[in-house]
Amino acid sequence: VTAIYLYPTLILYGFRKHATYVWAALAGAFTNSVFGILRAYVLIALWQARPHLGGYDVVDAVTFCFVTQAMIGPMQLFGGGLGIPERIRSGDIALDLVRPASLQAWTLAEDLGRAAYLLVVRGLPPTLLGALLFGLTHPDGPDRWALFGLSFLLGVVVSFAWRYLVALSVCWLIDERGVATVSMILMTFFSGLALPLTIFPGWLGELARSLPFAAMVQVPIDVYLGKGDGLAFQVLWAAVLLALGAAGTRLVRHKVVIQGG
């Protein structure tokens, strides 16, 4: 019964906490909009030269551009956003481990609130601007919208689960910046943020579409465009990464106990 109230409260807390940084979010929305316009013109030129590249037409490509720009904040595609490394270094993680919920579930609930806030404040403006300037396609019915909503939620969970593992690494590495940098490169390149993974050739394309990063952007955008669903793929990677995160949490707890925390 406690969990029924606890986790919705934590989601609301995560939303409100990030709402205090409204100007930062609006600045991010402005930046995403500007880069979205620049990317759109590049993609228009590319698709005019190579029509139907990767199974997309020009409108699909421009829609891909602005919807992926809207995903940057909610999916936290440049990494971070959890605050766990700082708490591990300060020792405050010991307090987190005695809360009435697991560290992983607690942090996930807060992150869902963060994602919801950034979707509204940082995600909608570039999408609306793209629709106004270029004209974007959209899901063709309530069923497709519902599938996209579910896929988007699963993408946020996969993103969280990956970033959670990166954050836990500081318990053994002391400084997670190297891992975080590698993670940012992988998320940017293999999620589908830079370019649709459908245009990657041969074995590189097969590899990119099989990695968890594809579940963060490429699968949701394909659902949005009606190019497929991929929900089972997202569920699989969410389950795998969350299981690894749960195992990592147990190792962190053991390490804190051994060190007298």
Where are the language model's segments positioned?
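Hydrophobic transmembrane alpha-helices and immediately adjacent juxtamembrane helices
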Residues: 1-261
